[in-house]
Regions:
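Short, amphipathic alpha-helical interaction segments positioned at domain boundaries
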Residues: 66-88
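Alpha-helical hairpin
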Residues: 5-6, 34, 73
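Short, Lys/Arg-rich nucleic-acid/phosphate-binding segment
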Residues: 56-68
Length: 88
């Protein structure tokens, strides 16, 4: 099992992503209260390592498009991410 370390902002974003159906960027912005630029950076970082996927699929997102996209947890990492979220 891969040992995953998450920052506080990554935890906040993952906490609000619906692990079954995904969550759109606008909802994440409202729930996390993170500035849009920072939220885009966190989402791009999570997508870069493969923990989060974006629908429709793309390698990264930007300020202009992230609000309409849906973000979901990559099922391949779901168990490891749940364990990482429980650790402090």
């Amino acid at each position: 099992m891969k040992h995953i370390k998450l920052s506080g902002r990554e935890r906040a974003v993952l906490r609000y992503i619906d692990w079954a159906t995904g969550t759109n960027g606008d909802e994440l912005l409202d729930c996390t209260k993170i500035e849009p630029e920072d939220l885009v950076d966190v989402l791009n970082g999570l997508m870069e390592v493969g923990y989060v996927e974006m629908m429709p699929y793309a390698e990264h997102t930007d300020l202009d498009t992230f609000r309409e996209k849906t973000f979901e947890v990559n099922p391949s990492y779901a168990l490891e991410l749940r364990a990482a979220m429980q650790r402090l």
